[in-house]
Amino acid sequence: MSSVIKTIVVKTLQCTVKCVCVGVRQQYGLLRRHPKTIACALVGGIIAHDVLHLYAAVYRVENPWEFVPTEGPRGVIVLRVYNALRFTAAKWRWNCWTIFGKFPFNSEQFSRIMETSTERKPDLRPLLVPAHETIEVYPCNNIHSHPRSAEFRSSANEYLVRSVRRAGYPPYVVSSSKRDFCDGNRFFYCPKDFGMQFRNDPISNNHALVFTDVDYYANMNRWLQLFLPTCLYTLVPTRLNYSNDEFAYRFENNEIVYNVTGGGEYRHSLWDYKGDTVTVVDEYGNLLIFDIEQRRVQGDEQHRLIWLLPKAKITDPLWIVGPTEWYDKLLVRKTVQQGRLKILWEPIADDLSIGLHGSNYSVSLKGELFEAIRTRISCKDSTPYVSDVERMLREAKHKNFLTDAPILYHCFQDDVIIRPNVVKTGSFPVTYNAIPKKAPSVTEDPKMPGQVVTTPLVSQPALFAGKGFNADKACIEGRIEKVRNVTKFPIKYVRYAAEFVKLVIPETIAGTGVPNSIGMIREEQDKVAQRARFDRVAPIMSTQTENSIKAFIKTEMYAAAKAPRNISTMAPEITIQSSAYSLPMAKIFKKIPWYCPGKNPKEITLRLAEVCLQDPDHELEEGDYTCMDGTQSPDYSDLLLLPIYMRYFAKQYRGQFKNLYNQIYKQRATTSSGVPYNPEMTIRSGSSITTHAGTLNNAFNIYAALRDMGYDETTAWDKVGAVFGDDSLNANHQGEFHSYIEHVTKVLGMRYKSNLRERGQPVLFLGRYFVDPITSYDSFADPMRTIGKLHATANKNVSVEQGAANKAHGYITTDSKTPIIGAWARRVLEITKKKFKNGTGEEQYRCSNAWPQKDEAAIRAAMAAVLEVDEAQLIAQNEAVLKVNSLDQFPVVFDTYYDHKQLAEVDGQLVGTDLHIKEEDERQPETSIDSVPSTGPPPSNGDPNAGGKPTDGPSKGKRKVKGRRPRTAGDPATLRLTDAGSSRRVKPPRKLRPEAKRGGRPIETLVFKNSSLS
């Protein structure tokens, strides 16, 4: 069978070659026998081609149903063919002149030739185009179905007729109405037209043409061939779809569908009036040039007044091949269809209207914003969703972002390529190497503190801070020196501190505290490292040990480069001996309702529920500190932490604790790379009293703010919410607490920002969002903070698979029902099939402290609300995570962006080169709700325990509220016309007295501005 096919193919090729050879031989023989005939045929064919091409370019196909003037030459077809021959001769004349375009033309000679064939008209713009004039707006019959539109149309027509007469021209109204008593025509094209009498007045060379809302049905190129001044009132839409009380329109293909109240529907094409010049070719082959002027009408923004004014006539056909750009200036129909999209773009104001072909709706926005969103969507590493577009529109303050985002998203689908989201290990940055401002080491090779175990789920994943000399110096600069707080407490706050100490340690337990014995300390230390440290130093431990503070960079990941966080370790003897005091003290603190360290997850959730029940008419306030450890001033420690400890313990133990306290707050320290520094009174993050210090400082600030609001001591104490280190959640008491707490922390030298959370929204505390603490224990890890860190672990002492499994075991315990996070953990455990082994202390803690999770649907809905995405998108992303088959195939599900706050080297590039970047906390993303700032002083009928207006507190700002934009001042009966290319407003003229009334309504005035549209 194959041999037969091969034979057929060979025979076919042989026959084809033979036929070609015979044909070439015959043509060559014919050329030798009849050379003149063949030459004439070739030249004739070329000329015929040029004639047909030029004829088609100049004389386009006309719609036989369009309005055309009855005046004109006879034998139009013959004239056009004759003109096409003239154009062909001009083309060959040009080719000979420029040697078929090989040499540039002589512009001086071309201009001299064209000058001899140019007939110019005087500039008619001063006569016909308005200059700060007014138009009488005539009232319409009250029974009219769309009276306002009719008023504009009739008034514009009357104005154009009068202005033409003032200029010395008799008006000729095309498709005239009953109110037109001048020359014009009226033909019958639809049943509605038979209600008026037929007219067809002759057109003279002195007429000026007036088109009022009818040019859509006219062949404007034929009318312009009369070379007469032409004035129009016409629809020039700025959007693809529009509606008001009287009319609405939309585009279907390149036609506009116009509906009016009363049931009328009109469908037609529009003329594209653009630029400052219009060209037309008349039936005699002359090029006619017109000036074009446009004016917008305020109050009737979808219509314009347009003037097409004769400027010059060129009779030499050489214009068709010269540099006149006549073809680009021809008046053509407006086209909005571009593939599957419909687009209207006004380049001067950069107003863009875009929609899908076949849709009745569109989106109006700035062209720059559209291009920015399109570019960001097309460059996404992850699959784009409607929520991505919605978020970008909202950030750009786009008014209708909810309804416009889905429409705009579908407009991108053909242009945006959806790429696979697989990112191979090693193709993304893992660490950043901080560079200090002063004396950095240029030869240092920093250490990689962790290891990557999977591909990241975000496009720009979190980074480890590299360790070394430069990192230590950057830490000192950013975490200690830059935020150092030496502010003294004002007298009022010294008094508040004394009250606070007495409330923490009431009289009933003051002086009763007894430190634990050394043996009890070992029993309470449940970590292996703690017991090993105890066993190593216990036999030789002395009460006179000198503390040695050594700081190291904490192995953790950051969303972007910033000053690394340090841990200040104490001498083991100091840690053990101070624990003898801190452990019994912690038991006292745990009895305080607002004190959350030591509480289990359910107890913390119950406390949050109690906070949420306070002042339910106002928002919840989430505390957000920046570098709290570094901003502790001496007064915070000396007026709060130290007095509380000294007040609780019996007198015989106070001296020893004071010595330990002085050793903890020793003023000399060194880093792991040997850099010395002065920590002053900053919180010692590696001491046994670290959590106590941060939590007490935070709670005191809340207490002081409540006291400033006028609450008495007991009420202020009872209203303190939930506090854990630098995390806090409080009711926004009286709607003003957030202002007072920010004021207090500012006065006391700390860096704080209130994040207001509307009731019903998930609440953020301890890096977790609580769905609804009042009704549910459900919570989930802060999504973007957690998802960006899933791909790496600080544990370098295990294999990649074991490191991934250890991390997954922790999250399967705390977030098994959390979308994406729980899916990642389950998939990692299914792939590795490993149990927990040799995990870090943090991983062990996570595995042993499960946050309750029950309602998966509620968690998913809350997470979607936090991420501002659709639940369907979250489900799709969750499914994408569950489909991977290896650790290096996890997809990118979110786009993230680095916001570097520290000069550093990342993946071979220098980032954060602006050394004066504002410091921000890396604890969580911003969730501040700016729409609910302070409204003023507390209400007098508020809490019965609240006092009067505080004498010293934050300034009272106005609450931002949403509402309608106020109406523009001015006479509503005065309408203004502005230049179509300008956004400036026109100063209103002196108000005119109504001289006449028609139909019981005064005559209005329409004002417009004299400036050109480019």
Curated annotation (Swiss-Prot):
The keyword Secreted does not apply. Residues 918-1014 are annotated as: Disordered. It comes from the Viruses. It catalyses: RNA(n) + a ribonucleoside 5'-triphosphate = RNA(n+1) + diphosphate. The keyword Ligase does not apply. Residues 956-967 have a biased composition (Basic residues). Keywords: Nucleotidyltransferase, RNA-directed RNA polymerase, Transferase, Viral RNA replication. Belongs to the nodaviridae RNA polymerase family. This is RNA-directed RNA polymerase. It comes from Pieris rapae virus.
